[in-house]
UniProtKB/Swiss-Prot annotation:
Chief location category: other
UniProt record similarity statement: Belongs to the UDP-glycosyltransferase family.
UniProt-annotated glycosylation sites, renumbered to this chain: N294, N346
Protein name, entry field: UDP-glucuronosyltransferase 1A6
PROSITE patterns cross-referenced by the UniProt entry: UDPGT
UniProt key word Lipid metabolism: no
Any GO molecular function: protein homodimerization activity
Organism of derivation: Homo sapiens
Length: 532
């Protein structure tokens, strides 16, 4: 017995030291994030990887929004030619411009210019990073095992190529929905709606025509947004570079998708779905928020937030919203830092910040007023809370359309809606049981999975670090030209064969026909000469 006990102790100690050794010799990961809400899900993955013993270095511009110090990673800071005030002003302009009136004809141009306010800033960051020789030398000397990035803008993609590192993308979507084109996934326009169209996967003929035309315009939009990055990449890599080719070198795509929100579509084997990764177990609320909920009585609360980029609204619109909120019996917790509307009702409480997921997970929450950003939509799905959606930009319009199609919420045009529209929408999602039933059904489907999204994401990042990439998952479609991919050369060859055979057959028939006619003609002539 004592011998068995000693053996067990030795085995236990061995397992402990092996685990400890695995933690000590963890891999090195270089993280190139995108500031703002995109960082939130990436941060969760980074923290778990750090807890598992990996050494994490996060590349951070010295002026930023959310990329703060942490015990989980080391920040590598690089200088940028602007200050915190300019950063704040750009984001404020970006948010406020979405409430400006615009005509149908000028809307695309206005949206493009507004997006460039922020995208231009990210390009300055990328330029500053890739031209900082000291920082690049540090990366080379550090000998990282992989690079983890958000590829919505391609700075991390270029850096991975420069350092020769396998890469993992954490991704929601490009501004022009070309991620499936880059991954070579089948992407038929007949049933897969393009970004910003607000179409479902069951399109009318006219919608399919529009979808087809948008598909033709997407490469041009990509060129407009990314041509500067292509020039920058060529200068850094000292060769002519095609950005699309760089994107195609990714090892694994971690896509913040789930088919409870997305329309079904084919994907490639190196594309992993981790939609809902931001959903966490509800934590206890602070005394302040618990008091608000307790005071709401049987009617419960409504949570109202338009995301991290928008916390102020033009006065006239804010007053219209406040008027609608005052006409429902629920207590409304509104994340808002602008001027307090003069008509704000007693049931509406303004807060500078709110624990969104924890509030949505509370059983007294009746509805969620949201801009339909992917984080908020997934938190609403996870917690089973119906939505009133006021999309502002990016993928929010499409997210809202998807949830409305599934009967989980009501969509309003924030520029055109009236106080009465918002009031009616709130009363509908709160009082009509079908909205609650539909969102609970989606919640049940979403949470019925073998592996949690966060665990899945961590596994694949570690997989790429362990194996120095995932070439076995890379489809051969990347090695084909566009005409080979669509089998145009094969079609052309077979068409040429058919035409050649048809031509030869025609010539043979024509020759035979002429021969036969010629023979008959000679026979007739001979017959006539004999009769004479």
């Amino acid at each position: 017995m004592a011998c068995l006990l000693r053996s067990f102790q030795r085995i236990s100690a061995g397992v402990f030291f092996l685990a400890l050794w695995g933690m000590v010799v963890g891999d090195k990961l270089l993280v190139v994030p995108q500031d703002g809400s995109h960082w939130l899900s990436m941060k969760d993955i980074v923290e778990v990887l750090s807890d598992r013993g990996h050494e994490i270095v996060v590349v951070v511009p010295e002026v930023n929004l959310l990329l703060k110090e942490s015990k989980y990673y080391t920040r590598k800071i690089y200088p940028v030619p602007y200050d915190q005030e300019e950063l704040k002003n750009r984001y404020q302009s970006f948010g406020n411009n979405h409430f400006a009136e615009r005509s149908f004809l000028t809307a695309p141009q206005t949206e493009y210019r507004n997006n460039m306010i922020v995208i231009g800033l990210y390009f300055i960051n990328c330029q500053s990073l890739l031209q900082d020789r000291d920082t690049l030398n540090f990366f080379k000397e550090s000998k990282f095992d992989a690079l983890f990035t958000d590829p919505a803008l391609p700075c991390g993609v270029i850096l991975a190529e420069y350092l020769g590192l396998p890469s993992v993308y954490l991704f929601r979507g490009f501004p022009c929905s070309l991620e499936h084109t880059f991954s070579r996934s089948p992407d038929p326009v007949s049933y897969i709606p393009r970004c910003y169209t607000k179409f479902s996967d069951h399109m009318t003929f006219s919608q399919r025509v529009a979808n087809f035309l948008v598909n033709l315009l997407e490469p041009y939009l990509f060129y407009c947004l990314f041509s500067k990055y292509e020039e920058l990449a060529s200068a850094v890599l000292k060769r002519d570079v095609d950005i699309i080719t760089l994107y195609q070198k990714v090892s694994v795509w971690l896509l913040r998708y789930d088919f409870v929100l997305e329309y079904p579509r084919p994907v490639m084997p190196n594309m992993v779905f981790i939609g809902g990764i931001n959903c966490k177990k509800r934590k206890d609320l602070s005394q302040e928020f618990e008091a608000y909920i307790n005071a709401s009585g049987e009617h419960g609360i409504v949570v109202f937030s338009l995301g991290s980029m928008v916390s102020e609204i033009p006065e006239k619109k804010a007053m219209a919203i406040a008027d609608a909120l005052g006409k429902i019996p629920q207590t409304v917790l509104w994340r808002y830092t602008g001027t307090r509307p003069s008509n704000l009702a007693n049931n509406t409480i303004l807060v500078k910040w709110l624990p969104q997921n924890d509030l949505l997970g509370h059983p007294m929450t009746r509805a969620f007023i949201t801009h339909a950003g992917s984080h908020g939509v997934y938190e609403s799905i996870c917690n089973g809370v119906p939505m009133v959606m006021m999309p502002l930009f990016g993928d929010q319009m499409d997210n809202a359309k998807r949830m409305e199609t599934k009967g989980a919420g009501v969509t309003l045009n924030v520029l055109e809606m009236t106080s009465e529209d918002l009031e009616n929408a709130l009363k509908a999602v709160i009082n009509d049981k079908s909205y609650k039933e539909n969102i609970m059904r989606l919640s049940s489907l979403h949470k019925d999975r073998p592996v949690e999204p966060l665990d899945l994401a961590v596994f694949w990042v570690e997989f790429v670090m362990r194996h120095k990439g995932a070439p076995h998952l890379r489809p051969a479609a990347h090695d084909l030209t566009w005409y080979q991919y669509h089998s145009l050369d094969v079609i052309g060859f077979l068409l040429a064969v058919v035409l050649t055979v048809a031509f030869i057959t025609f010539k043979c028939c024509a020759y035979g026909y002429r021969k036969c006619l010629g023979k008959k003609g000679r026979v007739k002539k001979a017959h006539k000469s004999k009769t004479h």
